[in-house]
């Protein structure tokens, strides 16, 4: 019998993924990662629900303590990034270093199993010609999570199953209901796990970064107001600046070194290109010449036509066909060919 380890968060998606594989004849082992120190939904209610689902399905359930890893790779990563004036994207980092990597390692070393599965909405295929595993968008475009999975290595893709990739979200809930799963009607998470457990990103960051007053200035250096910490702002932000101006102003730069928030009109928050580092080429090998693609510079943004120019040291330059508003350092840029994820990386800081 084929064996698979299913990552269970205690939500409807991962629960349904486990039920589907169980019905397909897999020997399913449920695995929950204990991520956050202290109290929080994903390490209390979620863990309890995951255990209950395993009992319903008649499968074993294991819990792995990943709190120290999560603290180092996600909490510290976020705090350091925001303190340096960037807006980090923790989810792709978490998927690679906290979830998929450790899950595959645990499955192989502790359970003698080469396959894992999760409730992510994405698809994986194997291309015989290139000998590469390809990451594809989910059938349900509204739920597609391929953007957050761009950093998975070929080894991790080869070991992973996404049972929900060919399904609509409504089908997931229907299957969960048909199986009588406790999580069938469980509401979806609406924000980052850290935000949900702390109330807001501001509240989370204020636990780690002390307020530090500084100037809000325009691009010419004129002081327009005061702020209480650059970590409270993000590129493109318009609301909550606390300054009066005859025209709308947006955050165009976060100068953490000089403790300044730089604002300007919309044109100043618009860029024709950006540089991306820590690039992972997914469905194709790294090209030696520029390629055409469609890029997303944030999760819910529409794909935009772009020329991807390879640089040295796992970096690329993205040149957009049309200037883009609010390109945010620390966020992921992920480029596609249709449904296929070609590659992605982290947007670097730039100066206005």
UniProtKB/Swiss-Prot annotation:
It catalyses: S-sulfanyl-L-cysteinyl-[protein] + uridine(34) in tRNA + AH2 + ATP = 2-thiouridine(34) in tRNA + L-cysteinyl-[protein] + A + AMP + diphosphate + H(+). It is found in: Cytoplasm. Disulfide bonds join 94-193. The record marks 120, 331 as: Interaction with tRNA. Its EC number is 2.8.1.13. InterPro entries: MnmA-like, MnmA-like_C, MnmA-like_central, MnmA-like_central_sf, Rossmann-like_a/b/a_fold. The keyword RNA-binding applies. Pfam families: tRNA_Me_trans, tRNA_Me_trans_C, tRNA_Me_trans_M. Residues 143-145, 298-299 are annotated as: Interaction with tRNA. The active site is at 94 (nucleophile), 193 (cysteine persulfide intermediate). GO terms for biological process: tRNA wobble position uridine thiolation. ATP binds at residues 7-14, 33, 119. Keywords: ATP-binding, Cytoplasm, Disulfide bond, Nucleotide-binding, RNA-binding, Transferase, tRNA processing, tRNA-binding. GO terms for cellular component: cytoplasm. GO terms for molecular function: ATP binding; tRNA binding; tRNA-uridine 2-sulfurtransferase activity. Belongs to the MnmA/TRMU family. PANTHER family: MITOCHONDRIAL TRNA-SPECIFIC 2-THIOURIDYLASE 1, TRNA 5-METHYLAMINOMETHYL-2-THIOURIDYLATE -METHYLTRANSFERASE. Catalyzes the 2-thiolation of uridine at the wobble position (U34) of tRNA, leading to the formation of s(2)U34. This is tRNA-specific 2-thiouridylase MnmA. It comes from Trichormus variabilis (strain ATCC 29413 / PCC 7937) (Anabaena variabilis).
